[in-house]
């Protein structure tokens, strides 16, 4: 279901905006085998921006059904490998873009990656479904925040991270080194408490790496925990990268 709010412009312009907006929505849904079954159209009471396309507001209500049990965050097991599907750093790149500090080429590269749907990765995961014990997507809480969620109520488990293996979008670490960070970063830094004992880094972390661990993500990567056999298979052809493992003691 789609709710589309159009700007206050002449009717013919509204019709064209609606047609183009619906075409854009369908282009994404069709690729993933989803259907647009209906919706509502409204008109904004605010002044129309220029260009008028900036005044289009879209809300989608998405429902799905699966014949199989979903992967949860809570299934982490000793010996599991931790894999990530794409780089981190969108939060700081957007923060830098607001002040002109982010290079245009770096921002374009990140946007290109963010625009790629990850639904095709699910097809890649299907052959090893039974070997995957936990899965989530990294959002505004950052990598470390989601690792903390995986560890909740998992007494005796620890995570050993390879900081050098954690991927970052081009330009992200440089921005951290210049003191730039997202507005959500200060609250996310509370997750650094996990580094006291439960989450350990193989190498002493740089200040930039510490910031990357809590950088809030938009269109962030998938993070999964699986056994070593599945990890070897998934990392062989990409895009999966192994960033650590779960251990005991």
Q: For each predicted feature, which ranges?
A:
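Solvent-exposed, charged interface segments at domain starts and junctions
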Residues: 1-5, 105, 121, 154-156, ...
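Glycine-rich anion-binding loops of enzyme active sites
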Residues: 2-103, 245
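Glycine-/charge-enriched secondary-structure boundary and capping motifs
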Residues: 11-35, 42-58, 127-132, 136-249
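Active-site glycine-rich loop that binds ribose-phosphate moieties when present
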Residues: 61-70, 105-128, 205
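Short acidic/polar alpha-helix capping motifs at helix-coil junctions
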Residues: 87, 107-113, 194-200
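Short, contiguous, pocket-lining structural segments
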Residues: 89, 109-117, 135-143
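Short hydrophobic/aromatic-rich motifs at helix boundaries and adjacent loops
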Residues: 91-95, 116-120, 144, 203
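Adenine-nucleotide phosphate-binding core of ATP-dependent small-molecule kinases
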Residues: 104-111, 133, 184-185
